[in-house]
Curated annotation (Swiss-Prot):
UniProt keyword annotation of Lipid biosynthesis present: yes
Catalytic activity: a lipid A disaccharide + ATP = a lipid IVA + ADP + H(+)
Protein name: Tetraacyldisaccharide 4'-kinase
Pfam families from the UniProt entry: LpxK, Trm112p
Highest taxon of the lineage: Bacteria
Any GO CC annotation of this UniProt entry: plasma membrane
Gene: lpxK
Function: Transfers the gamma-phosphate of ATP to the 4'-position of a tetraacyldisaccharide 1-phosphate intermediate (termed DS-1-P) to form tetraacyldisaccharide 1,4'-bis-phosphate (lipid IVA).
Keywords per UniProt: ATP-binding, Kinase, Lipid A biosynthesis, Lipid biosynthesis, Lipid metabolism, Nucleotide-binding, Transferase
This protein's pathway: Glycolipid biosynthesis; lipid IV(A) biosynthesis; lipid IV(A) from (3R)-3-hydroxytetradecanoyl-[acyl-carrier-protein] and UDP-N-acetyl-alpha-D-glucosamine: step 6/6
UniProt region (Tetraacyldisaccharide 4'-kinase), positions on chain: 1-370
Length: 430
């Protein structure tokens, strides 16, 4: 089955996406047949999951995936950090899982604030540093996200919710909520790779859309705007803040090993900074191999993501954090989703609830009795381990995460997948 996993071509190392990804010119149309082959592979893989030939696994806690459908940087990691802080403010214990792109190891491990980015990946290292002081947010990386989730929950069993940094296309991890992030280039020319920037066809089903530019069309999901700006101060490796205004007039060497380095350089210049030299490197570039070729008297300035790799060898570098301003309506919508998704209480082995979940119904008394409301609080969807909603009129237990409705017969819920019916899109929107 692994042969059917689509492998899109990588972006040109270290520089902006091809210009033909933004318009449907000759180059894009020439690659269009390959894009159709890629489309077929994507559809075939998704079909294998829908048919049950490939199994998606759920870790037993609500999973929120923050991802994108375009190649290159969309600003997912700052969204994950903002989400983690928001969920903490709501009293939830948050964990973060990721693959750790660009790291030298393929094992499953915890990410600490001082973990080398080369071993855990630059984005996970950045997230761990953000939560070094204050309420802890455990971060785990693994090639398989489900392995990272299980390791995190084994080490931190009190975790209420998991955030997955990237992984919208990682269908092996069953999720409860999907957030798709777009940068200001949107859908580009709308073609799939390699003719365009899309990793999969759009529109696709997601729960929320966050967009830095115009809202992408075609999706019924609620869309909310995002504004990105540079923080007013750069940071030294020791945590000291340096106001950007103080750097005006100084010649700077700006370095960026991100998907869209030109955007970072433009934001620096918009702050009135003088860039004597700009250097764009491949995204996730191993900066341990980087050698400074410019005048060492130039102040070295970089992105916050690059700093976690640059500071061990160049502690004099300044890092400029990115500040994210998300439409408050998004957090209001997220808060409305949260109450029913809190971690469910443990179910005692041998109890009626455990028997029902296992699919062995307890013996009913001869007289009819309604379903005990207390029992509902103990039940979870057997497929996703997510919460259930009782539809009294239809006598069904609704699982939005699994898109299934389980029957309730004589007051007893029958949580068997082969007894459930699929929910329609219209029912999911209600």
């Amino acid at each position: 089955m692994g042969a059917l996993r689509p492998q899109p071509p990588r972006m040109p190392a270290g520089h902006v996406a091809p210009a033909y990804w933004q318009k449907r010119g000759l180059a894009a149309w020439a690659l269009w047949p390959l894009a159709q082959l890629y489309r077929a592979l994507v559809a075939a893989r998704r079909g294998l999951y829908r048919a049950g030939w490939l199994k998606a696994q759920h870790p037993g806690r609500p999973v929120i995936v923050v991802g994108n459908v375009i190649a290159g940087g969309a600003g997912k990691t700052p969204v994950v950090i903002a989400l983690a802080r928001h969920l903490q403010a709501r009293g939830l214990r948050v964990g973060v899982i990721a693959r750790g792109h660009g790291r030298s190891r393929r094992d499953c491990r915890a990410v600490l604030p001082d973990s080398p980015a080369s071993a855990v990946g630059d984005e996970p290292a950045l997230i761990a540093r953000h939560f070094a002081n204050g309420p802890a947010v455990p971060v785990f990386v693994a090639r398989r996200r489900i392995s990272a989730a299980r390791a995190l929950l084994a080490a931190h069993p009190d975790t209420d919710v998991l955030l997955c940094d990237d992984g919208l296309q990682h269908l092996a991890l069953r999720r409860d909520l999907e957030i798709c992030v777009f940068n200001d280039q949107g859908l580009g020319n709308g073609f799939l790779q390699p003719a365009g920037p899309l990793r999969e066809p759009w529109p696709r089903s997601v729960d929320f859309v966050l967009h830095a530019g115009a809202a992408p069309g075609g999706s019924p999901a609620p869309a909310f705007g995002v504004q990105r700006s540079l923080a007013p101060c750069a940071l030294r490796s020791d945590g000291a803040a340096v106001p950007l205004a103080r750097l005006q007039g100084q010649p700077l060497h700006a370095l960026a090993a991100v998907a869209r380095p030109g955007e970072f350089f433009a934001m620096l210049q918009a702050r009135g900074l003088t860039l004597a030299h700009t250097e764009a490197l491949p995204d996730h570039y191993d900066l341990q191999r980087w050698e400074r070729m410019t005048d060492p008297r130039l102040t070295l300035i970089c992105t916050e993501k690059d700093a976690v790799k640059l500071w061990p060898l160049h502690p004099d570098a300044l890092a400029v954090p990115l500040v994210l301003h998300i439409d408050p309506g998004f957090f209001a919508a997220l808060d409305a989703w949260l109450p029913a998704r809190r971690a469910m209480p443990e179910i005692a082995p041998g109890s009626d609830a455990a028997a029902i979940i296992a699919g062995t119904e307890p013996t009913l008394p001869e007289n009819h009795r309604p379903m005990d409301p207390k029992l509902l609080q103990l039940l979870v969807c057997p497929v996703t381990k997510g919460p259930l909603r009782y539809d009294r009129a239809a006598q069904e237990l609704i699982s939005r995460s699994a898109r299934l409705a389980y029957p309730v017969r004589d007051g007893i819920p029958v949580l068997l997948e082969n007894e459930a019916r699929p929910l329609t899109d219209e029912e999911l929107e209600q």
